[in-house]
Amino acid sequence: MFSSTLHEDGPATRTRSSRRRQRPVASDSSLQTQPKAKRQRVPLTESNTAPTPTPADADAPPEMFEVKPDPVLAKRERDGIGIENIENLGPRRELSLRSKKPKSGERTSKGDGSIILTTNNAFTVSKLPALPDRLRAEPTSRQHGAIFSSGYALALTHTHAFVWPYTATTASPETFTFALPYPSKHASDPLPLGALVPPSASSDDPGLVVVMPVSGRVVYWESISSAATLDFIRQQRTGIEDAISGMYSSEHITQLVSAESAGFVLVFSSGRIAYMSVRDPHGRPGITVQYLRSPFGGASLGFLSTLRHALSGSSRGDIAAAHANHGPRVGERVVIAASSKGRLQAWKIHRGGHHEPVAEADVRERLVEAVNEADAKTQAFPSESFEVLDFAFVPRGLEPKYVNASRLSEALTHEEDSLQHMLLLVGFSRGHQARYSLVETVLAPEGARIGTVRPITSYTSPVRPGALEKPRLYLPRPALVAFVVFDRAVVVASMVAPPDSPDSQLQEDSHILPPTFEDVVDFRDDDTLQVVGSGSEEPGAGTSSEDVRPHRHKTKNPTAVLLLPGVGIVRVAITDIERFASDAPPRVTAKSKLEQAVFFGIKSDNPLVFQGRRALPFSDREVCDAAVELSHEIVNSKTPFIPSVPASLEGNMKSRSAYLDALITFLNACKVNMDERTRWMLLYDAEKMAVATWIWQKHEQFLAERPRADKKTLISEAAVFINENQKTELNVAAGQVDPVRHWFIHDIFRLDIFVAWAYQIIKYHYTQKLSDEPGLNRLVWEAVTINNGALLEARQFRLDKAAQYGVDPAVVPTGNGLPEPWTSTYFITNNLKRLTEFCHQWLAKHDAQPSADPRFDARLLDTVRERLPSLTSQYFTSLSEYITWAASSTDPETQDRCRAYQAAYAEDVYKKIVKLKEFDLWEEAVELAREFEAFDALADVVVGQILMLEAAAADPTTTESKAQENAALAQVKKQRLGRLMEEFGEGFASRAYEVLLDAAGVQAVLEFAFDRKGFITKWLRGKPELARISWVNEVLREGDVGGAAETLLGLGMSREVQVWNKKVELSLGKLALLAEGGGSDDEAGKGEVGGTIKKIDAELEVVKVQDLLYQWILASVHEAVDSSAEVELAVKQFGGLIPRRQKALLQIFEDGIARLLKHEVLDPLTLIDLLTLSSLGPGHYEGMGDQFFLALKVAHYAALENAEEVRRLIWRRCLVRDDWRQVNETNLKGDEEALEAVGETAAYRTLFACFDEESSTPTFRPHHTLKPSDCLGVYTEPEQLDSRFAAMDDSFRGKLVEAMRAEDRLLRGFVEKAQLDEWWRATRETAERMVGVAAQKGHRRVNSGSVGNGGVNGLSLNGRVKMY
């Protein structure tokens, strides 16, 4: 930058001239004799005074000039810049030095040094580097300015004017600073107005004119460069000063409009307009001002009348904009002024100040009507709010292709000088809303015509009252794109014709422009960040051979250029204007908006803002689809915004992660209603980027830890060995030679395959013996590190970012439309299982036989052991995720795999946790089991650890101190077991007791003292097979004798299978019941106990009958060599009465004998079958009692549901045991002989025993109300058979029924042909009488115990006891 003190910025030095004069030596006397001139080069970055330049600075070219119009060096300060004595300046010979001008067409650098702020398929927004240091250092200072086609920018404050080439490629450009002669008195005063004046014939550089709005003072410099040079050399005034006469006290100037070469137009706050010239007719500097007459007002109107008649119908100060267009002849310009209410006025101005009104029109009503018709939303705004904000002239002389592409009217083709073709920026406002439109207007002497209306739909913010600059409209060549510049936004609007369609044709007929490309560039809401000046660049400007100005920007596309304090120059450039005229014009897409927000909004120093101003003009579905597409492109580096060959891969990956974070942040800020699928897909992409970054860092760690000769890590191997169909192939011809970096740049979306390939590398190296044992050990360690760490990182990222992505991390997404979780794909889960099992083998191998190779790193092996529980946890989690996701799928293959995974999970969640015990990972196994609520494994591990410690404590080889330590630790683990029971409840406690019972026995279960919730009691009560332990627990732990009795009785009555056990259990239960009920005063309780005791006694009676039968049969088979022989002998000896053809009865008898000899508890019906089918011999009466009587007792005490049918069966078998036809043959027999025949029958013996039992048990009366004929027909039909045979096949059941019918036929023969019913009555009476006789003789009752013997103890009818 040119400065009175030499600036030392690096970039500036690159643009300085190399033609420097040799620095004189200190002894050079010429320096001492030359007078010292005061240099006014003050650096903009300095404050207050300019220090004396040092010798080191003397040969640097000046970068900034400060020009003083006052010839007298007054000792005053303006805007902090002091004026020192002339002695402080450097040697005069440096003052004329300037940077060398490049030749025509020469570029100062290959690039313009700009920084892209955003870009899309239509335009690019960039920040140019050139900005005066002082403006950059004081962004809060009040300023405004303008951009000129000459390549210069102008900025004005209250005290200074700054001119610099804004297209310069250095940050500190050559800057000309002009101290204004008459600065504003108050900070609130309007800022000075300024403009560059086209170069004169004697100079290539423009001049500068500055007008003070309030005072009307004008200062003009003919050339900015010569003014600076002369001012420094001569120290005298080089600017021309004057004042505008005729201004009112309350009037100030609002606009300074260039109408060169004719001069300038001044717009006053009162509404007046004046012409100002800065050169006289001979081209010499000179300032003159003339007020313009109102159109059609006549020459008689003076300047005062002009104030009344100008813009007739409008209020004072109502002029919104004034612009000058080329006139029909050289030196002529047409100036048009537009009032905010829609009144247009036109003058033709000649060089020298001559002017004439040419047209006037009030188009307000027509504008309102046209806009309302084109944009229905404006009808909701009050018509009083309508105003014209600015206008721009439509370029003439356009190429036919641009004319055809434009939707403007045929006026584009007219070349009449009398027609002024314009585009008006108009708007409605209401509160915080506004609607803007671009309206084509043609102004002619006879009036105005309204053409196409182009609504602005993307920007609805009203104009800020405090904005330093009013909205500006630019329509640069070829008039296909309009730029609407607001204080904090720029609208880029296409003016091309939309594609042909019926709708577009109707809209065209109505002068309505259908929607075409439109986008908004927003600036941040910062007090210092607003547009304070603007301009445009257009193709063709400055391309003539005579134009040698180095700073004029040559462009092929229309551009808007903006000036923002603190930021500098911002250029909004159309990328390719030809696309707008093509069949595929650019359009705003959801993806392009997302790209801008993501890739440029992430920069903290970007003055643009991409969110929060307005909703996205797309549906949620469009935005979601675009977001997913963009996310994939970021992950795969398929977007041009991400370099494909980054210098730092880690930095590149972190940037991509930041882009993904910016994407979801933007979507949330815009309140996009994302569906669940979109949220999960975006989250999965972000997870993959985060994990891939972590893996790359591990890769670099692996490389650093490996020796120089062995740099092939598991990660580099995986990148090479992954199937070519599962990765992007290298293009070696294009220089792609690094497969690892290439994968991390292009294939991260396949991260699940990469992670799964870790096991494949191990498997390949192991099976192919590509690595020795130390090398394979390192690969195993790397594989475990990558698999475990990658999945941990992914799930932690998911947990941390769940709220941001709007998902529940604890819920696996399900549904056919939702993607498969990448952390639980088939490749991941399958290879995790294999890797885990390989680690088991690898650790077991080296635990059994440690490696003797000195290169084998045991620390890596220990790390694998330490990470094995975590790796197992990741395997379980992946399995669980996949099962949950696949369960909702309708794909048959997925469903099959889901079922397979469910089975694998159920198996592995136990086996692989318990497996950890083998590697002394007890605590880790406990935590893993707790995490997955694997209660079986948890119980196994916890109990196993307790038993291991107890065994170690009891080991005689263990030292006493170690034994005590183990015993104490075992107690601690028992306490933890108790806490786990409380934490996980009954299910876990039950499993723990099962493990404890199986491993340590009953004593360990009953002695466990840390069950505070009584889970053992619930467990034992719920386990009928453990009733023998349960009743002990009831007594010892619960103190519940009644409960013990209930347990014992329940076991003995319904579940016990061994006779002896049943007898003991019933007896103990009875004892406990008596003990519990003995202390009760409750009569109801006593009654209940009494009823239970009766049931016990009945069960015991049945048991005693079985025991008697067992003892009788055992005596006959005690010589058998084995159990099979016992059964065979018993069947042979006691089953002789069963006909061989009746196989069913024989099978029942044989099965019953086998069970009887095994001491099994027989069901009552089986026991009755044995008693009634056996041939026990005559001696059994005395030994055990009558068999049929015992069968009747069983039927009586067993309380059978079908007791009557059973009794009929018993009596039928009893009656058919004897041949009643012989008893009925009484011929030649006396009474005594006949009675003796009756007394030898089984019926008599059974009846005698029944009457004898009845004397002690009145309820026992199985012989009353029954006669032989009543026993017919029992169990003779299949449906009558008892429940024992319900599951038998029909063949067996048929045979059994046939056997029953055979019995029935035999009995029927006795009834019908042997008078059995009559003999039954006589036999019954005889048995009853003989029981009485026996009682009178004082004989012991046959049933005095509980079982009678069926005989009469010598009181038989054999003659020793006579009948009376």
From Swiss-Prot:
Listed GO biological process terms: poly(A)+ mRNA export from nucleus; protein import into nucleus; transcription-dependent tethering of RNA polymerase II gene DNA at nuclear periphery
Tagged with keyword Transport: yes
Cellular component, GO, one term: nuclear pore outer ring
Chain intervals with Low complexity compositional bias: 49-62
Protein location: Nucleus, Nuclear pore complex; Nucleus membrane
Segments of this protein annotated with the region Disordered: 1-114, 531-554
Keyword Transferase applies: no
Keywords: Membrane, mRNA transport, Nuclear pore complex, Nucleus, Protein transport, Translocation, Transport
Gene3D superfamilies: 1.20.58.1380, 1.25.40.700, YVTN repeat-like/Quinoprotein amine dehydrogenase
Gene Ontology molecular-function annotations: structural constituent of nuclear pore
Pfam families in alphabetical order: Nucleoporin_C (PF03177), Nucleoporin_N (PF08801)
Domain of life: Eukaryota
Biased composition range(s): Basic and acidic residues: 1-11, 65-81, 90-110
Membrane topology: Peripheral membrane protein
Chain's role: Functions as a component of the nuclear pore complex (NPC). NPC components, collectively referred to as nucleoporins (NUPs), can play the role of both NPC structural components and of docking or interaction partners for transiently associated nuclear transport factors. NUP133 is involved in nuclear poly(A)+ RNA, tRNA and pre-ribosome export, in GSP1 nuclear import, in NPC assembly and distribution, as well as in nuclear envelope organization.
Subunit text: Component of the nuclear pore complex (NPC). NPC constitutes the exclusive means of nucleocytoplasmic transport. NPCs allow the passive diffusion of ions and small molecules and the active, nuclear transport receptor-mediated bidirectional transport of macromolecules such as proteins, RNAs, ribonucleoparticles (RNPs), and ribosomal subunits across the nuclear envelope. Due to its 8-fold rotational symmetry, all subunits are present with 8 copies or multiples thereof.
Family statement drawn from the similarity comment of this UniProt entry: Belongs to the nucleoporin Nup133 family.
Protein name, entry field: Nucleoporin NUP133
